[in-house]
């Protein structure tokens, strides 16, 4: 059995990435026929059965898909594509303030309010406090909005900051640290967006 996130190559075949959206020893190869027949897309969470590894292959092949994104396998081809959806302004606010000591959250609510479905990019020089602010945002979202499934993508960060974030928030932390190639940053970011 294998469970992970599907990454699809330009040639049409793919891999189930089991280790934090990146290549790992427990990954599985997915033939393009399975991807095409089921209507699988990059970023899908796939659960399935693998066969024995082939002699000339690095990863064992995926033989059968049991679940996709926690649900049934049927009807995946009918899903709307993200790029075809109508973009709208966020109309449900995510309150950042929680308690009297939440100064960062209060400031964000006043200066740059955040809404459900909104994406954000924080860019700043090193040691400016961006990771601390991002940690506070993630903590506020999980405290004030427990129904939200939180993803936190860290790109070009130090491994220590990734570990701190994983320990500090309740949600999925996906990271491509500064010691990884720029190509890896792009691949991981695209998988999370999908």
Regions found by a protein language model. Give the residues of each.
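N-terminal "pre-motor" subdomain/linker immediately upstream of P-loop NTPase catalytic cores
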Residues: 1-78
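Hydrophobic alpha-helical segments
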Residues: 11, 186-189, 193
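Conserved RecA-like P-loop NTPase ATPase core
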Residues: 14, 156, 192
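Phosphate-binding glycine-rich loops and their immediate beta-loop-alpha structural context
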Residues: 87-89, 93-189
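Short solvent-exposed strand/turn elements
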Residues: 79-88
